[in-house]
């Protein structure tokens, strides 16, 4: 499959993320999380670090029209896609450590799916989620486990590091269940429980390898100062060198095992 022209533009990553990753990768996890929370009619839901909003959208589908659902993200690009896909949801730009919730109304449910690991101030973000949650409300936070536990992401990172040097991949940087549990306890949550969950998802191999390489370049020290031409050259080289990973696929698709910690708690 050929990627459209915008695939080389990092500014267009939100469209790529929604088009090729949300459905096969993030929706199954959002559905698992929403099921775990046991939503009930009338629940107000806050999705923190919502990206293009898949957790909020799954919640809205369960609760129906008229439900109070708010999604918050720091990325205007992600929110632009979210608004285009689901205009009925209240999307707000803001950071997790200073949630834009001026109305002060608490939420029955707070979700943070694969966002916590990116927050510069995790205790402040956890405290903000605690304040946003109504007494007795339910929290769900998920973070990928270390990529050392998942063969394909680990191998793709090692390929990229041959060209970029060591990469601190934030996506997998908060995989210790004990750290996650302690963070939530310190923030004042009750009944904290962290479980390891796994899902095998089916992804378009070429697209996944390319998007993963784009993300790794962006997280590398050198990638932050590359010119567009240099970024494209390095991207093409990493994609080329990652080709052996595609040999395990069927019809161009890869079965990718994903592992995540899923923490639940109450306010």
Regions found by a protein language model. Give the residues of each.
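Conserved class I S-adenosyl-L-methionine
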Residues: 1-43, 54-58, 77-81, 85, ...
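C-terminal helical/coil "lid" or tail adjacent to the Rossmann-like core of SAM-dependent
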Residues: 3-6, 11-16, 20, 26, ...
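Class I SAM-dependent methyltransferase SAM/SAH-binding core
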Residues: 44-100, 124
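Short glycine-dipeptide loop
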Residues: 65, 133-139
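A short acidic, Gly/Pro-enriched loop at the edge of an enzyme's catalytic core
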Residues: 97-110
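A short SAM/SAH-binding and catalytic strip from SAM-dependent methyltransferases
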Residues: 109-122, 145
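Conserved catalytic/acceptor-binding region of the Class I
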Residues: 123-124, 138-204, 223-227
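Core SAM-dependent methyltransferase catalytic element
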Residues: 188-190, 212-213, 259-267
């Amino acid at each position: 499959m050929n990627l459209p022209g915008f695939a080389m533009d990092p500014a267009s990553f939100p469209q790529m993320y929604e088009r090729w990753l949300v459905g096969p990768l993030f929706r199954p996890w959002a559905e698992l999380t929403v099921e775990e929370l046991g939503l009930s009619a009338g629940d107000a839901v806050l999705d923190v670090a919502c990206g293009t909003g898949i957790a909020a959208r799954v919640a809205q589908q369960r609760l129906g029209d008229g439900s109070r659902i708010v999604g918050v993200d720091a990325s205007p690009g992600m929110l632009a896609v979210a608004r285009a896909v689901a205009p009925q949801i209240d999307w707000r730009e803001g950071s997790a450590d200073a949630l834009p919730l001026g109305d002060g109304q608490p939420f029955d449910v707070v979700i943070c799916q694969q966002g916590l690991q990116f927050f510069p101030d995790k205790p402040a973000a956890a405290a903000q989620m605690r304040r946003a949650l109504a007494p007795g409300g339910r929290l769900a936070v998920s973070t990928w486990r270390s990529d050392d536990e998942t063969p394909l992401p680990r191998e793709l990172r090692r390929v990229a590091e041959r060209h970029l040097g060591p990469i601190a991949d934030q996506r997998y940087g908060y995989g210790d269940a004990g750290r996650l549990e302690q963070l939530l306890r310190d923030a004042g949550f009750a009944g904290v429980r962290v479980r390891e969950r796994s899902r095998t998802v089916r992804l378009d191999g070429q697209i996944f390898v390319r998007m993963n390489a784009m993300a790794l370049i962006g997280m590398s020290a050198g990638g932050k100062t590359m010119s567009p031409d240099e970024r494209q050259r390095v991207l093409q080289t990493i994609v080329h060198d990652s080709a052996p990973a595609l040999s395990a696929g069927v019809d161009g698709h890869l079965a990718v095992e994903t592992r995540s910690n899923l923490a639940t708690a109450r306010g």
